[in-house]
Design a protein with these regions (language model features):
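Active-site SXXK
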Residues: 75, 92-117, 144, 203-207, ...
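Bacterial Sec-dependent N-terminal signal peptides
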Residues: 14-36
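Active-site-proximal alpha-helical segments within enzyme catalytic domains
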Residues: 199-206, 246-267, 319-335
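Catalytic-site signature segments of enzymes, centered on catalytic residues
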Residues: 88, 156-246
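Active-site Gly/Thr loop motif
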Residues: 280-330
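Active-site helix/loop module of the DD-peptidase/beta-lactamase fold
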Residues: 111-151, 182-184, 211-246, 250
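A short, well-structured edge-of-sheet supersecondary motif
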Residues: 55-86, 321-322, 328-332
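Structured C-terminal helix/loop/strand segments within mature extracytoplasmic catalytic/sensor domains
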Residues: 315-362
Length: 362
């Protein structure tokens, strides 16, 4: 029995990490599939293989609570590691969905004449009975994208296990859009950042109404089918409103594709799916929060005194797509750290600063 247990635990290491005759550490090149991703070896792309293998050992030892990690360098997938068998499958990407909603907003703006300064009230004539006073009528599409609507909303300050979290109250409501837009105002639109998944849902409904098709149809025709994405589900409420704040499920490789799409200015396999202008605009600070753009987060990593700017998609529990253009890096993490979302980010950030960036700059 002891021998069988040792074989089970050692085989993953032997599969992905080996040594040549001169004791050089070798990472196995990720599998080349027909999904549009091109693979290469870490060594061929100039990364420090020994440092990356040390990182993998640390994760396998349980120090970072990571389910999977994928790294692309110079547009090549050079590392693909799964630390749970289930992590190879479809992952609920949580609020990473918001960044995909941002991409669809860009398509609606560039191709369907959606205007950022359009008041939200214009899209919902059936909700004219709501109280639109106290500047609520001034909320625009731009305010939705920057999480600065001014609507009263308590989400990030409470655990998602707390029944009083407005995100949970939203899920219990019969009409998501009316529940969100019926909230009273707590500040002027554009003045205060307040994380609100409801705004992403309202944004998704606006995109659907502006393009005269469902978010599901738009995402498949404009993005997913062109990127060979294994689209599984996008949850909706009973009336058909899409959960564009956190309802998508992807394979980790499909998450990586989305990061590569943005790193390449909206181009995937030679086709311009998003305008370069929108990619730049949506990943640059636009509102009152220095760390937030249009449904993308912003971060700086400092390694050996050098600062590397990045933008990233962040989903509850440790789902990340991180793009560091200066180093031509795209990094994907999946995890299940739902009890402490900030710890999940800290774990991933430590891997980036201690291993991934150093391995890429040597």
């Amino acid at each position: 029995m002891t021998k069988r247990i040792l074989v089970i635990f050692l085989l993953p290491l032997l599969t992905f990490i080996s040594c040549s005759d001169d004791n050089e550490v070798v990472l196995e090149t990720p599998l080349q599939k027909s999904d549009g991703i091109i693979t290469s070896s870490a060594k061929e792309q100039g990364l420090n293989v020994k440092l990356l293998s040390t990182m993998i050992d640390e994760i396998r030892a349980g120090h970072y609570s990571i389910n999977s990690i994928l790294i692309a360098k110079n547009n090549y997938l050079i590392l693909e590691e799964y630390f749970l068998e289930s992590a190879k499958g479809i992952t609920a990407i949580q609020s990473v969905t918001k960044s995909i909603t941002s991409a669809l907003a860009g398509i609606a703006i560039d191709e369907y004449n959606l205007l950022l300064d359009t008041p939200v009230i214009n899209f919902f004539p059936e909700l004219s009975h709501l109280d639109w006073s106290n500047e609520k009528e001034l909320i625009t599409v731009h305010n939705l994208l920057t999480m600065s609507s001014g609507l009263q909303w308590n989400e990030s300050a409470l655990s998602y296990n707390n029944p009083q979290n407005d995100h949970n109250l939203l899920n219990q409501s019969d009409n998501w859009i009316e529940f969100i837009l019926s909230r009273p105002m707590s500040s002027s639109p554009g003045s205060v950042f307040n994380y609100n998944s409801g705004l992403s849902i309202v944004l998704g409904e606006i995109i659907g109404r502006q393009t005269n098709q469902s978010i599901g149809q738009l995402s498949i025709s404009k993005l997913f089918s062109k990127m060979d994405t294994e689209f599984v589900s996008w949850s909706t409420e009973n009336s058909g409103v899409y959960q564009t704040g956190g309802g998508l499920s992807f394979l980790p490789r499909d998450m990586l594709k989305f990061g590569l799409l943005y790193q390449n200015g909206g181009v995937w396999n030679g086709e311009q799916l998003l305008s370069t202008g929108w990619v730049l605009q949506s990943t640059t600070q636009q509102g009152p929060n220095m760390e937030y753009a249009y449904h993308w987060w912003l971060a700086s990593f400092t390694v050996d005194g050098q600062v590397y700017e990045s933008f990233y998609a962040w989903g509850n529990g440790g789902q990340f797509i991180i793009v560091i253009n200066e180093l031509s890096l795209v990094i994907v993490f999946t995890a299940e750290n739902f009890e402490d979302n900030l710890l999940a980010r800290a774990n991933s950030w430590k891997l980036i600063t201690d291993y991934i960036i150093p391995s890429s700059v040597e």
